[in-house]
C-alpha cells in the first residue's frame, strides 16, 4: 500500500492548485456571495478546459481516464480553496456511476458535456427520516420496461440546474433501482434549499414519475451493489474534501498565531495554543491516512467498507475538532463571517453531516464487525 504520488499526479494537482489559487480567492468568493450566488461557472469552465473536470472519466467520453486516487487529490484541493464547483456532486456522485454502469447511449448522452463543463449532473442520496442512504424510502414500481418513482429526496445539490438527477429507489421485493430523472419531467417538484456552505440544493418530490427503460441506469438485479459502489466513493470524496478544508484551516491558524502577538510574544508560543494546534495537526494527518487508505483499496478493487466508514468518521470527528480549534485560536476574528476562516468552518460543518455523521459511521463499522467470523 503506497500512498506516494507520482509525477503525473503531482502535475495534475499542481495545475488544479494554480487555477484554484488564482480564481477561488477570498475576494472572488465574497463577490459571488454578495451577488447572491455560490456556483462559480466561469471557474468550472476553466477547470474543464484544463482537463480537470473530466480527469476521472473514461477517455471515450472526453475524460482523462484517471482513477479515484486522482479525483480524491483534486477534491482535497477543492476543499483547501473552498472552491464553489461541483467536482464532488457532478463528477464523483453522478458522472462516475454513469461511466461505470451506464450503457453506451447513457454514457455518450451526458458525460462528454460534463467533461467539457457544459452540463451539471447530481445525485439524490439523502432522504429525511432515513439515516441509511443504502435503504431508500423512495419507491420504484415496475411500469413496462421502465419504472415509476415516488418519494421525496432532500438536500440534492444543484437540483434546479442539473440536466439529470441520479435517483436510488427501492422496489417492492427489496431490490434497488438507480434511475436517471429529468428535473423538468412531469411529476417532479423542486423546492429550493440552501446548505450550510451556501451551496444551492433542493428538496425533490417525485410523484409517480415515469422513467423509461433508457433512463434506468441499474436495475433491481444489480442495484444494491451499484448503490454500495456509489456511496463508498461518495463518502471518500466527502472525506477528501474535508481533508482539504481542515488542512487549510490548520495552515491559516498556524500563520495567524505566529503573527499575532500578545504580551510581547507570538501567541503560537503559548503552550495552550501550541497544544491545541498540535492536536489539530494529529487530526488532519489521521484524516489524510484513513482517506488515502480507503481510496487506495477502492481503486484497487478491494473490499473497503470498514475503511470507508473509518475515513468518514475521521472526517466528521477530526474535521469538527479542527474547525473549532481554528476558530478558537483566531479569537474574535474567528467568528467574523467576513473573515475567510468562516467559509472553512461552514464547509466543515456541512461535510461533517453529509451522508451520515460520526454515529452513522460507527454503526456501519459495528455492523460489519458483528457479521465477520471470529
Give the label of every model feature segment.
Residues 124, 150-189:
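A short core secondary-structure module
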Residues 99-102, 141, 167-170, 180-183, ...:
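Short beta-strand-to-turn element immediately C-terminal to the catalytic PLP-Schiff-base lysine
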Residues 85-105:
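N-terminal glycine-rich flavin-associated loop
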Residues 66-67, 132-135, 158-162:
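Short glycine/proline-enriched turns and hinge-like loops at secondary-structure junctions
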Residues 110-112, 128-129, 137-139, 153-157, ...:
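A generic local secondary-structure boundary/capping motif
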Residues 1-81, 101-104, 117, 142, ...:
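Alpha-helical interface subdomain recognition
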Residues 117-128:
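A short, Trp-centered hydrophobic/proline-enriched beta-strand micro-motif
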Residues 135, 155-156, 182-218:
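Flexible, small-/acidic-enriched active-site or ligand-binding loops
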Amino acid at each position: 500500500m503506497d500512498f506516494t504520488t507520482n509525477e503525473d499526479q503531482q502535475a495534475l494537482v499542481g495545475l488544479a492548485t494554480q487555477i484554484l489559487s488564482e480564481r477561488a480567492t477570498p475576494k472572488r468568493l465574497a463577490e459571488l456571495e454578495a451577488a447572491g450566488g455560490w456556483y462559480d461557472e466561469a471557474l468550472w469552465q476553466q477547470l474543464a478546459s484544463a482537463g480537470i473536470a473530466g480527469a476521472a472519466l473514461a477517455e471515450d467520453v472526453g475524460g482523462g481516464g484517471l482513477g479515484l486516487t486522482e479525483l480524491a487529490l483534486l477534491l482535497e484541493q477543492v476543499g483547501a480553496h473552498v472552491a464553489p464547483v461541483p467536482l464532488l456532486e457532478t463528477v464523483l456522485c453522478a458522472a462516475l456511476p454513469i461511466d461505470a454502469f451506464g450503457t453506451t447511449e447513457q454514457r455518450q448522452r451526458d458525460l462528454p458535456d460534463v467533461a467539457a463543463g457544459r452540463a451539471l449532473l447530481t445525485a439524490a442520496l439523502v432522504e429525511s427520516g432515513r439515516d441509511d442512504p443504502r435503504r431508500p424510502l423512495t419507491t420504484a414500481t415496475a411500469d413496462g420496461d421502465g419504472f415509476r418513482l415516488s418519494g421525496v429526496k432532500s438536500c440534492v445539490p444543484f437540483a434546479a440546474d442539473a440536466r439529470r438527477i441520479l435517483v436510488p429507489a427501492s422496489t417492492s421485493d427489496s431490490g434497488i433501482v438507480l434511475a436517471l430523472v429529468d428535473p423538468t419531467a412531469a411529476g417532479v417538484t423542486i423546492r429550493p434549499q440552501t446548505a450550510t456552505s451556501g451551496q444551492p440544493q433542493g428538496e425533490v418530490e417525485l410523484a409517480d414519475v415515469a422513467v423509461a427503460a433508457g433512463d434506468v441506469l441499474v436495475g433491481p438485479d444489480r442495484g444494491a451493489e451499484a448503490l454500495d459502489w456509489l456511496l463508498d466513493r461518495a463518502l471518500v470524496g466527502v472525506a477528501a474534501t474535508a481533508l482539504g478544508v481542515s488542512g487549510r484551516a490548520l495552515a491559516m491558524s498556524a500563520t495567524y498565531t505566529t503573527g499575532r502577538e500578545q504580551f510581547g510574544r507570538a501567541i503560537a508560543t503559548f503552550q495552550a495554543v501550541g497544544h491545541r494546534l498540535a492536536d489539530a495537526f494529529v487530526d488532519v494527518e489521521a484524516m489524510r491516512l484513513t482517506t488515502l487508505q480507503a481510496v487506495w483499496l477502492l481503486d484497487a478493487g478491494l473490499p473497503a467498507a470498514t475503511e470507508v466508514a473509518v475515513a468518514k468518521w475521521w472526517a466528521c470527528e477530526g474535521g469538527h475538532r479542527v474547525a473549532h480549534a481554528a476558530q478558537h485560536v483566531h479569537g474574535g476574528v474567528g467568528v467574523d463571517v467576513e473573515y475567510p476562516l468562516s467559509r472553512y468552518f461552514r464547509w466543515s460543518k456541512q461535510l461533517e453531516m453529509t451522508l451520515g455523521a460520526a454515529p452513522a459511521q460507527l454503526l456501519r463499522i459495528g455492523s460489519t464487525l458483528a457479521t465477520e467470523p471470529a
